[in-house]
């Protein structure tokens, strides 16, 4: 047994977070698909918690959708959500951040993920946060060991998308 109480040879139950899972542009969706498949191939159990656009995953992997206001979708990027779309506290916060010029997706997603994961803390051995880095991740980390992957600043994703 490890100091964390886990058998180092036993497969892990992993909650994998990706606030955007775009399958063909930006890298997060592609990285998510290949990494989670490799983890399952190694014998681990993986559940992906994702925001729009949702990733395309191996059929052995569960996707738990954490819908956002999707203000930066492909068809109408920067759209202004209607008041009827604000159904939760997280929606209201996402809208407030959006109105102040802040890119709201990571922060809002992390809050949604914390609300979803903290009651389920006993179901997972590890959380892998794929570049979200929002404040909600700190809440999750209080209950479940967490690792983070940071690929590059988010401004690079936008530059790449705008150039194509």
Describe every region a protein language model picked out:
Residues 119-124:
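Glycine-rich phosphate-binding loop signature in dinucleotide/nucleotide-binding domains
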Residues 14, 126-129, 140-159:
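Active-site proximal beta-strand in glycosyltransferases
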Residues 35-44:
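A short, Lys/Arg-enriched amphipathic alpha-helix followed by its capping loop at the start of a domain
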Residues 18, 50-52, 150:
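Short beta-strand/turn micro-motifs composed of small residues
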Residues 105-112, 144-145, 155-164:
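Nucleotide-sugar donor phosphate/pyrophosphate-binding loop at the beta->alpha transition
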Residues 130-134:
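Short, solvent-exposed amphipathic helices
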Residues 18-33, 102-106:
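A short, glycine/small-residue-rich beta-strand->loop->alpha-helix junction that serves as a flexible
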Residues 2-12, 47-117:
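A conserved catalytic-core segment of Leloir-type glycosyltransferases
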């Amino acid at each position: 047994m490890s100091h964390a109480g886990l058998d180092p040879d036993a497969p892990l139950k992993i909650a994998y977070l990706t606030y955007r899972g775009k399958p063909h542009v930006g890298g997060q969706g592609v990285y998510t698909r290949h990494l989670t498949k490799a983890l399952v191939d190694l014998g681990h159990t993986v559940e992906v918690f994702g925001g729009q656009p949702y990733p395309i995953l191996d059929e052995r992997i569960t996707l738990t959708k954490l819908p956002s206001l999707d203000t930066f979708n492909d068809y109408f990027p920067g759209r202004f959500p209607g008041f009827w779309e604000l159904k939760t506290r997280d929606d209201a916060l996402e809208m407030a951040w959006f109105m102040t010029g802040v890119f709201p997706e990571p922060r809002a997603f992390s809050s949604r993920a914390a609300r979803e994961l903290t009651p389920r803390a006993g179901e997972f051995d590890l959380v892998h946060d794929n570049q979200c880095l929002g404040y909600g991740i700190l809440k999750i980390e209080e209950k479940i060991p967490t690792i983070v992957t940071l690929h590059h600043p988010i401004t690079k994703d936008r530059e790449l998308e705008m150039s194509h």
